[in-house]
């Protein structure tokens, strides 16, 4: 028997994020569904107060993991324009889509044609008009420069070495002055022999060298091992 939701309330810190409280006292993150009745990755849908909410699983989304671990600042609001590098099958972009709403836009870059097709089926074909799908390689932003206009936030979640460099290169092309970047550091994708903390420092230093002010770093355990989320602003 499923556990009933007894309360839905706005998150105390982050715009467009909600807390679902269940009858057993547990709480889960959620966003308000931009396309009611439609799921992206099998998530629970909850109707409350005339709206529908999608449970946001921190084991499936690095951004949800960062929020669950107490990140203080997420630079995403209604109307925010985002460049998302490494969109995969669309779990986190779909929740960003809920948050930014119809005035926002998410340019979603994915390299794998197979995964890109899945992204199209789950997001674009389901009516998320604020998502712009781009089949491309995040290492070469000039290849999709004609698709992307200036963005407020550049976000990266790719299993590549030089993750911070890839993000900074894209920021040089597309980030508005004073814009923000969000870097998911996957330590094992960069150097399997080095301690994760050393890899985190290395990637953070790359951002600093490229002119970014580091605002916050949050480790993502227990949801993802040897991962961290970094939020920075272009000086």
UniProtKB/Swiss-Prot annotation:
GO BP of this protein: box C/D sno(s)RNA 3'-end processing; tRNA processing
Q: What is the lineage of its organism?
A: Archaea, Thermoproteota, Thermoprotei, Thermoproteales, Thermoproteaceae
EC number in record: 2.1.1.-
**What's this chain's function?**
Involved in pre-rRNA and tRNA processing. Utilizes the methyl donor S-adenosyl-L-methionine to catalyze the site-specific 2'-hydroxyl methylation of ribose moieties in rRNA and tRNA. Site specificity is provided by a guide RNA that base pairs with the substrate. Methylation occurs at a characteristic distance from the sequence involved in base pairing with the guide RNA.
Family that this chain belongs to: Belongs to the methyltransferase superfamily. Fibrillarin family.
Q: Which residues bind S-adenosyl-L-methionine?
A: 91-92, 110-111, 137-138, 157-160
Per its UniProt record, what Gene3D superfamilies does this chain match? Answer: Phosphorylase Kinase, domain 1, Vaccinia Virus protein VP39
Q: How does it assemble?
A: Interacts with nop5. Component of box C/D small ribonucleoprotein (sRNP) particles that contain rpl7ae, FlpA and nop5, plus a guide RNA.
Annotated SMART domains: Fibrillarin
Q: Name one GO molecular function term.
A: RNA binding
Q: Which UniProt keywords apply?
A: Methyltransferase, RNA-binding, rRNA processing, Transferase, tRNA processing
Which gene is this protein's source? flpA
Whether NADP counts among this entry's keywords is no
Q: What is this protein called?
A: Fibrillarin-like rRNA/tRNA 2'-O-methyltransferase
Q: Which domain of life is it from?
A: Archaea
Alphabetized InterPro entries for the sequence: Fibrillarin, Fibrillarin_CS, SAM-dependent_MTases_sf
Which Pfam families does the record cross-reference, listed alphabetically?
Answer: Fibrillarin
Matching NCBIfam families: PRK04266.1-1, PRK04266.1-2, PRK04266.1-3
């Amino acid at each position: 028997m499923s556990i009933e939701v007894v309360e839905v309330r706005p998150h105390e810190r982050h715009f467009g994020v909600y807390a679902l409280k269940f009858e057993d006292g547990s709480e889960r993150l959620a966003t308000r569904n931009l396309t009611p009745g439609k799921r992206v990755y099998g998530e629970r849908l909850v109707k409350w107060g005339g709206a529908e909410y999608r449970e946001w699983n921190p084991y499936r989304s690095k951004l949800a993991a960062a929020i669950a671990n107490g990140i203080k600042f997420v630079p995403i609001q209604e109307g925010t324009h985002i460049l998302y590098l490494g969109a995969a099958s669309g779990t986190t972009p779909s929740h960003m889509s809920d948050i930014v709403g119809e005035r926002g836009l998410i340019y979603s870059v994915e390299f794998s044609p197979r995964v890109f097709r899945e992204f199209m089926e789950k997001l674009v074909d389901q009516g998320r008009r604020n998502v712009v799908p781009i089949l491309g390689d995040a290492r070469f932003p000039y290849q999709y420069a004609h698709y992307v206009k200036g963005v407020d936030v550049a976000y990266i979640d790719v299993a590549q070495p030089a993750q911070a460099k890839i993000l900074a290169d894209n920021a040089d092309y597309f980030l508005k002055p004073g814009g923000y970047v969000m870097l998911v550091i996957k330590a094992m994708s960069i150097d399997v022999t080095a301690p994760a903390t050393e890899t985190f420092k290395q990637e953070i230093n790359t951002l600093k060298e490229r002119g970014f002010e580091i605002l916050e770093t949050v480790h993502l355990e227990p949801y993802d091992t040897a991962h961290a989320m970094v939020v920075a602003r272009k000086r």
